[in-house]
């Protein structure tokens, strides 16, 4: 069952990336595990990481909860403004828009990102 859930998530992620690959816009790509959450802003060509934030940083320990996701969202918004990125496409990597994913997205929007 676990393998089927992962396959379905990866299929959803592939559909999003195929649809947005031709658009000339940066992606805010996230990944979550049971203990951590990661966020990266990837260039429009898909080959360069412009900014990143995760709960692996010393300031953002205890990363398996919604509060840590909010802090990562704020950090990625701050990092994005430092590299002059305002508009992104939110790539949730096939994860449901609920809980930690939603908290990260809301915090990034409040930080100034537009998606």
Swiss-Prot record:
GO BP terms, alphabetized: translation
Pfam family, one: Ribosomal_L18p
A cellular component term, taken from the record's GO annotations: cytosolic large ribosomal subunit
One GO MF term: structural constituent of ribosome
InterPro entries: Ribosomal_uL18_bac-type, Ribosomal_uL18_bac/euk
Keywords: Ribonucleoprotein, Ribosomal protein, RNA-binding, rRNA-binding
Quaternary structure and partners: Part of the 50S ribosomal subunit; part of the 5S rRNA/L5/L18/L25 subcomplex. Contacts the 5S and 23S rRNAs.
Family, as annotated: Belongs to the universal ribosomal protein uL18 family.
Function according to Swiss-Prot or TrEMBL: This is one of the proteins that bind and probably mediate the attachment of the 5S RNA into the large ribosomal subunit, where it forms part of the central protuberance.
Protein name as catalogued: Large ribosomal subunit protein uL18
UniProt lineage: Bacteria, Pseudomonadati, Pseudomonadota, Gammaproteobacteria, Candidatus Pseudothioglobaceae
Record gene name: rplR
């Amino acid at each position: 069952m676990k393998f089927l859930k992962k396959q379905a998530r990866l299929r959803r992620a592939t559909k999003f990336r195929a649809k947005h690959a031709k658009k000339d816009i940066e992606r805010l790509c996230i990944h979550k595990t049971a203990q951590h959450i990661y966020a990266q802003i990837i260039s429009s060509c898909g080959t360069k990481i412009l900014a990143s934030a995760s709960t692996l940083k010393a300031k953002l320990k205890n990363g398996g909860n919604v509060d840590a996701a909010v802090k990562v969202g704020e950090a990625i918004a701050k990092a994005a403004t430092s590299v002059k990125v305002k508009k992104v496409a939110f790539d949730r990597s096939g994860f449901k828009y609920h809980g930690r994913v939603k908290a990260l997205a809301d915090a990034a929007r409040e930080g100034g990102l537009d998606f």
